[in-house]
Amino acid sequence: MSTEKLASDTSFSLSSAPEPAICPEAERLVRKQETALGYRIMASWGWGADGSGHITARDPERTDAFWSLRYGVPFGEARVEDLVLVDHSGDLIEGSGEINPAGFCIHAPIHSTRPDVVGAIHTHTPYGTPFSAMAAPLPMSSQEAVAFYGMQGVFAGEEVNVTDLATGQRIADALGTGRLVVLANHGLLTVGTSVASAVGFYLNAERAAEVAVKVPDGRVISPAAAAQTHPSVGDELNGWHIFQWLVRSRVGDPTVVN
């Protein structure tokens, strides 16, 4: 869904869904808009105020390259024009400036290993980072956690500052075919078949981590109930819907990124 339509659309409903890509150029713009909006959503909570955090979006044509925010741009000021395109070797393809080096080392192997992943997001949050010190998967103790039932991994390495692609590959391996990887003593990372769903599910992960931190001995949802609920709350479309709500409630006018 383009931000132009989102800005004036009054028909957002349970049946809303992403518009099919018309051409690579249009799809590229949507991915870049969602990326810039994702950064602004993070900023609305104060996440990434110190520059720690990154969102990436695979290019629809240069599938061996991804877009991310130019280093030095405050997340709350992110615009489409502030994104740069780099390939999996780190070469700058389009735009000017650099991207977060840890972001490159973490995200490049994920995009390379997982061709189904369009968007990926990681930052340091009030509950995701404390929970990550457990070096354990999220417990199924909330509805939000069920979105990751059978779809999460744990990277237990002690490289809390990722500075090389080899460590990033180990993170990608820990993620496997899942949607969430807990980076021990570091934070959370989610992926999606769109930038929108990756960001939407990141909020789910943060909320699930909050429950786990605040109520560590709370009741855990049974495997049977989690398996029954997962197809609805864990659907990619649900992640996309969460993103639409976040844009409306946390950003307001989505055209600010254009």
Identify the function of each model-found stretch.
Residues 2-38, 179-258:
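A conserved C-terminal secondary-structure "cap"
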